[in-house]
Each structure stands twice: as C-alpha cells, then as structure tokens.
A protein has these predicted regions:
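A structural signal for short, well-ordered beta-strand segments and their strand-loop junctions
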Residues: 1, 27, 45-47, 83, ...
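Conserved N-proximal alpha/beta basic substrate-recognition cap immediately N-terminal to
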Residues: 1-27, 33
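Short glycine-enriched loops at secondary-structure junctions
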Residues: 3-7, 112-114, 162-165
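Short, charged, surface-exposed secondary-structure boundary motifs
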Residues: 9-12, 57, 169
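Short gly/ser/thr-rich secondary-structure transition/capping motifs
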Residues: 25-28, 150-152
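Phosphate-binding site of ATP-dependent enzymes
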Residues: 31-32, 39-45, 49-139, 149
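ATP-dependent carboxylate activation and anion-phosphoryl transfer catalytic cores
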Residues: 133-196
Length: 196
C-alpha cells in the first residue's frame, strides 16, 4: 500500500467516510458528549483511535464510576479523542474480516467469533476464526469502498463488518489471509500478487 495512504487514513476513523454503512458513531474527548451518546444508545463500545488486536476496547452498558474512570483515562482527561459506537448485538455471531485485494472483495471471509463471555472477536483477544463465503451485504459494502482504496493506491485492505455495519477499514497490516487459506485452500496472497 502507498505509504502516503497509510499516513492519510486513520484505520478507526476511515470508516466514517462511509456514513451509510457504519453504526452510530461519535469521535470525541468530551465526557459530556460521550455521556449524551451513551444516554441515546444505552450500550456502546469505546476504543482508542490507535489500538489494534482488540486492546483497550470496552463495552459500556452502565455509566458507573468505574466506567467513567476508564473513559477519563482513555481520553487523557478530555485531551485525547476516542471513538464511541453503538453496540451491535450481532458481534456474538462474528466480527467478519473481508479482504479487498486490488479493488475486489475476496470471495471468502473470516468470521472472528468471540470466546464465551466476551464480545471481542479479534484473534489476538482469543476469538476463533471461521472461514465463510462472503454475503451479498458484505460484498456490497466492499464494492462501495473499493474505488476509494484503488484511487489511493491501497491494493490490500481488510474491512471489518459486524452484522450489517462497517466498523473498520484496516490498511496497515490486515490479517486473516493465513486463516482463510488454511480453511479454504484459496489463497488471498496469491490473488494479491496476480495484480502486481
């Protein structure tokens, strides 16, 4: 991927360029704005703008003092923006990684299914990866994003979809190609090299 694109797009924020596909989202450092967002949705996810692998992602279903302390810490006492999104119950069925290679969605995806009692499907956080065929909705979202990726010389990306919602666009080091190959014998990396 073009290094300029890696500098231009924050992976957590990039998805907001496609508001028609994302869950309700707030990017803010203001405790009052985060509180109002929570009051509107009653169950939210909060995460830093620079995290990976499921680290520092919290589900907030009560604005008790413990959760407010976490928010204060994550926002560095309201100096650092974080991303807040309405919680998507479909996450328990899988956080799907869809690879977009040379402007085309790969036909197999990886459903990262959270371990019991957790909501994080990230493999690094203990989730289990299950390869599946891409759905029509996933393909539609990927095809809408692909032209922007191509225009910015991003030839290998991994988008994350939970239920019907786009949650992230990963362009730095998208994972899950190995798991897809191991389970389906279809090789995303081979597909990537065909386009070079």
């Amino acid at each position: 991927n073009n290094p300029c694109a890696l500098k231009k797009f924050n992976e957590k924020v990039f998805a907001t360029d496609f508001p028609e596909f994302i869950p309700k989202t707030l990017i803010s450092s203001s405790i009052n704005k985060i509180r109002a967002f929570f009051d509107s949705h009653k169950k939210i996810i909060i995460k830093p703008l620079d995290g990976m692998g499921g680290t520092s992602i919290y589900k907030v279903d009560d604005l008790n003092e413990d959760n407010l302390k976490i928010i204060r810490t994550m926002t560095n006492s309201e100096k650092t923006q974080i991303i807040c999104q309405s919680f998507i119950e479909d996450v328990y069925e899988g956080d799907f990684r869809i690879l977009i290679i040379n402007g085309k969605p790969f036909p197999k995806t990886l459903a990262r299914i959270p371990k019991d009692g957790d909501f994080k499907g990230n493999l690094a956080a203990g989730g289990k990866g299950v390869a599946k065929d891409i759905t029509e909705n996933q393909k539609k979202i990927a095809e809408a994003i692909a032209p922007i990726l191509v225009k910015n010389e991003i030839s290998f990306a991994g988008i994350d979809i939970v239920g019907k919602y786009l949650t992230e666009i990963n362009i730095t080091s998208p994972t899950c190609a190995r798991e897809i190959l191991d389970q389906t014998q279809l090789n995303p990396i081979e597909e990537y090299f065909k386009g070079l």
